[in-house]
Amino acid sequence: GFSHIAENLYLTDPCKVLLVTDPLPAPLLSHFLESRHVTVEKSDFHTLLFLIEPGDTKEKQDHLLSLLQECEAAYEANTPMSVFAPHLTCRKGEGLKDFSLRYQDFLCREGAARLTQALFDEDHFPKAMLTGKQAHQAFLKGARERVPLPKAKGRVSLEMILPYPPGITVLEPGEVWTDEVLSYFLFLQKYKSAFPDFSPEILGVHGNGNDAYVWVLKEA
């Protein structure tokens, strides 16, 4: 269906729209849009993904654009969070711009971009000590140990570790918890504490904050 695309060129999916929200936090914008009946497929720190369907109309497009313009105006006016997003947790008297700057400062201070990038660096990929089947069998046979998240470095995970967003497996069963992987998930615990309404779903990391733990292979 796309015969006009030149060879070796990447094809942008015409049914997906990726919106960069910086300086507004993408999860905040997602909450706002969903409260106005606009469905966001997913969000990370500063991007939103929308899916376009064949039946979508120009009216729906214009509606989304008007809501984004409303957000922009609210940001410039530093509209109180109690007005813009009354259902979200914020500091007393905090405006939308104040909240957004605090969010950005947190990500910069914690090195969110660096921590995320390290997960996709081939030099830092975890080593597999067991196959997925072996890890699953070890778990079922009781050769497992529950350890606090901060003490997971160097241990063999018996569960898949997956944060959503982005919905990409970071650690497969049988792979070793590396410093890069652990640092990222410790950061996510801080993120969940600082912005509880934006907590990502994390498969394989149980509990929250100081109570977070993971299942690893029991040491001999």
Spans of model-derived segments:
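Non-catalytic terminal extensions of PLP-dependent enzymes
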Residues: F2-A220
